[in-house]
Structure formats: C-alpha cells, structure tokens
Regions:
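Short, Lys/Arg-enriched, disordered terminal segments
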Residues: 1-8, 186-191
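Serine-esterase "nucleophile elbow" of acetyl-processing enzymes
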Residues: 3-53, 64-72
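Acidic/histidine-rich helix-loop elements
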Residues: 23, 48-56, 85-89, 164-165
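Alpha-helical cap/lid subdomain in secreted, periplasmic
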Residues: 61-191
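Active-site micro-motifs of SAM-dependent methyltransferase domains
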Residues: 19-20, 40, 54, 84, ...
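Conserved G/P- and acidic residue-centered "switch" motifs that form tight phosphate/ATP-binding loops
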Residues: 15-16, 54, 81, 169
Length: 191
C-alpha cells in the first residue's frame, strides 16, 4: 500500500491516563493503535503519546511548551479535565487552563481537536452543568473540532474497561481510536 502525503504528518495526544495507555502494554496504547489504524488507511501520520497519567489541566499547562517543543507537530488532540473533575476543581479554573493550552498550540500553528469529558451527577447539578459546558464553549470560542465525550461508547461498560471501571481496556481503546480517527479524517484528511 502506498501511503498518502497528508496535511497532518505528526500529531500528539495530549491528555491524561485515558489517552496515555494506563494499565495497558505498549502495543495497546492509544497512540500506537491510532497510528496503525491511520496507516492502514494510507495516512502516514506519526502519533506521539504526550499524555501523562494523573495529569490535570494545570499539569498539562505546566508541560505543554515542553511537549510541543518536538519539531513539526501539526495537530494536537487535547483531552484534559477528567482528573480536575474527579478532584472537584472549579470548572472555571479547568477552562482557563485549557484555554491557555489551546492558545499556546495555536500560536505555534498547531491545529487542535478538543476531546471532552462529562461530570457524573454525583458532583451535583451545578458542578455538572458548569463542567460539561467547558468543551462546547471552548470549541465554539476557538473554532475547534469537538469530540463531545472521549469515552463515548466505552464509559460504564465493564467489558470495555479495566477492572477499575474507569480506564479503557484494549477493546475500549480500539473504540476510542476509531472516534479520534473519524474526527481527524472528517476535519483534516478530506480528499
């Protein structure tokens, strides 16, 4: 198979344990699966795992410059906030940190796809409402492609998650990879 030249040649997954491959062997990390899937469709795109387990949006902001110092990154898939939500961090703080990360990437001419999270109702109605609107609001403000919920089709499904019920297993990672792949193709790999 001949690999096609693409407007996207190198991308980084910038998130937390949900994208880092927590609990999975290296060959089952999301970055590896996504790169293989893109190549199987003829797209020669290097996918870098820039995700860190346990990372909050604040931690991401602290490391984004270093992560993006890798040369020639064309695209960042940003998915931070799950650990902020689990820790009850004020959604305004999370949104502010994500805005700064987006701005840093855009100032480097790096395209951004935003992959959102959703708070459970156990955090209370107001927290859920404020947290859940972070990602659509940022998508609109910065004109970013949005994956409304990174774990769509995976969350709360025991057969798609590890025994902790929070982190995707190999099968869950395949579903997330397909979700990311669709967004990349729809937004940046149009024929």
């Amino acid at each position: 198979m001949t690999l096609k030249a693409s407007a996207i040649e190198k991308m980084v997954l910038f998130g937390d344990s949900l994208m880092a491959g927590y609990g999975l062997s290296n060959e089952h990390h999301l970055s590896v699966i996504l790169e293989q899937n893109l190549k199987s469709e003829g797209h020669n795109i290097k996918v870098i795992n820039g995700s860190v387990s346990g990372s909050t949006s604040s931690g991401g902001l602290n490391r984004v410059e270093w992560t993006l110092s890798e040369s020639d990154i064309d695209l960042m898939i940003l998915s931070l906030g799950a650990n902020d939500m689990l820790r009850g961090i004020n959604p305004d703080e999370t949104q502010n940190n994500l805005e700064q990360i987006i701005t840093i990437a855009q100032n480097k001419n790096i395209k951004v796809i935003l992959a959102g999270m959703m708070a459970p109702t156990s955090h209370g109605f107001n927290y859920k409402k404020d947290f859940d609107k972070i990602y659509p609001d940022l998508s609109k403000k910065y004109n970013l492609p949005l994956i409304p919920f990174l774990l769509e089709g995976v969350a709360l499904k025991p057969d798609l998650n590890q025994s902790d019920g929070m982190h995707p297993n190999e099968q869950g990672t395949l579903i997330i990879s397909k979700t990311l792949q669709k967004s990349i193709k729809d937004n940046y790999l149009k024929p």
